[in-house]
Swiss-Prot record:
Annotated protein name in UniProt: Nuclear protein 2
Keywords assigned: Cell cycle, Growth arrest, Nucleus, Repressor, Transcription, Transcription regulation
Protein's cellular compartments: Nucleus
GO cellular component, one term: nucleus
Compositional bias of kind Basic residues: 81-98
Family under the similarity heading: Belongs to the NUPR family.
Gene responsible for this protein: NUPR2
Function (record text): Acts as a transcriptional repressor by inhibiting gene expression at the NUPR1 promoter in a p53/TP53-dependent manner in cancer cells. Involved in the G1 cell cycle arrest, and in a decrease in cell viability and cell proliferation. Plays a role as a negative regulator of the protumoral factor NUPR1.
An example Gene Ontology biological process: negative regulation of transcription by RNA polymerase II
PANTHER family documented for this protein: NUCLEAR PROTEIN 1 AND 2, NUCLEAR PROTEIN 2
Length: 98
C-alpha cells in the first residue's frame, strides 16, 4: 500500500492595490504591532519611572473614584474612630508611674 501524497492547498492571492481601502496618512506608516507598542509602552511619562503604564494602572486598580486624597482623608477618619472605640472598650493598662 502506497502512502498518500500530501495535498498542498493553493494560497489565496491578496486583492490588487486598487481594491484596498484608502488609508490615512498615519495609518500607512504604522501597522498593528506599532500601535500596540505605542499604546502600551510609552517612551516617556509616569509609566517609565515606576514600570506601570496608564493603561495598566486603570486595568489593575480597584478604586473607581479618582479623588484619591478625599478617599485617604475618609479612610483616616474611619480608622481613628475605630481606634477610639477600641480604646474605650478595653480597660486602661496599669503602669508603674501611677
Amino acid at each position: 500500500m502506497e502512502p498518500a501524497a500530501p495535498t498542498v492547498q493553493p494560497r489565496a492571492q491578496p486583492p490588487p492595490p486598487d481594491v484596498w481601502p484608502p488609508v490615512g496618512s498615519e495609518e500607512e506608516f504604522y501597522d498593528c504591532p506599532d500601535y500596540y507598542y505605542l499604546r502600551d509602552f510609552p517612551a516617556c511619562g509616569a509609566g517609565r519611572i515606576n514600570g506601570r503604564t496608564r493603561r495598566e494602572r486603570e486595568l489593575r486598580t480597584n478604586w473607581l473614584v479618582p479623588g484619591g486624597h478625599e478617599r485617604k482623608i475618609a479612610q483616616k477618619l474611619l480608622n481613628s474612630q475605630r481606634k477610639r472605640r477600641q480604646r474605650q472598650l478595653q480597660p486602661r493598662p496599669r503602669t508603674r508611674l501611677t
